[in-house]
Amino acid sequence: MAAPAASGLSRQVRSFSTSVVRPFAKLVRPPVQVYGIEGRYATALYSAASKEKKLDQVEKELLRVGQLLKDPKVSLAVLNPYIKRTVKVKSLNDITKREKFSPLTANLMNLLAENGRLGNTQGIISAFSTIMSVHRGEVPCTVTTASPLDDAVLSELKTVLKSFLSPNQILKLEIKTDPSIMGGMIVRIGEKYVDMSAKSKIQKLSKAMREML
């Protein structure tokens, strides 16, 4: 059963890609590869929006779609599995007209409704946001500390982290607090991961001592 299902998903994505990119002969590759059915839709949308120079507009519209789907009334109207697809398509048409979405965003939502894939919408939005973040040269960085950092330490940390970036890259920093690491910090920047927490050091010490016995 898995193979036919996968084949069906591929046809849906090709259908979307063809419908939104039809005026153009060649797809624009995204700056980062995103996976799964959500990634395929997001990639096709990025290509079409890039060709039409509407990347920023589509990104804003998708964020608005995400907000709308969190509204209980909208969610009930378009995500309820017991509501007919034709009814969902009409509801979405009304929404896209009211919000004055671009044809790119409207076509995506209509196709998802017709193919019963509205449940993938948030994943597609997330995948598109990931592509756009890399497109802008943003480098995600998460720093976890046992207690909040004061302004002076935070400023110094930002300076150090930015020194690892190239001139055209932008640091996208998120600070988290987790008392369980006991002290120090854990840094994840891009695909790099450095654990300098006290908890990690204690665990390494404990392991080394056990190996000595």
Swiss-Prot record:
Species classification: Eukaryota, Metazoa, Chordata, Craniata, Vertebrata
UniProt protein name: ATP synthase peripheral stalk subunit OSCP, mitochondrial
Primary localisation category: mitochondrion
Gene name for this UniProt entry: Atp5po
Segments carrying motif SIFI-degron: 5-23
Disulfide cross-links: none
A GO-annotated cellular component: mitochondrial inner membrane
Subcellular localization: Mitochondrion; Mitochondrion inner membrane
Task of the protein: Subunit OSCP, of the mitochondrial membrane ATP synthase complex (F(1)F(0) ATP synthase or Complex V) that produces ATP from ADP in the presence of a proton gradient across the membrane which is generated by electron transport complexes of the respiratory chain. ATP synthase complex consist of a soluble F(1) head domain - the catalytic core - and a membrane F(1) domain - the membrane proton channel. These two domains are linked by a central stalk rotating inside the F(1) region and a stationary peripheral stalk.
Post-translational modification: Acetylation of Lys-70 and Lys-158 is observed in liver mitochondria from fasted mice but not from fed mice. Acetylation at Lys-162 decreases ATP production. Deacetylated by SIRT3.
Top-level lineage group: Eukaryota
Pfam families: OSCP
Residue interval of the organelle targeting sequence: 1-23
Keywords: Acetylation, ATP synthesis, Hydrogen ion transport, Ion transport, Membrane, Mitochondrion, Mitochondrion inner membrane, Transit peptide, Transport, Ubl conjugation
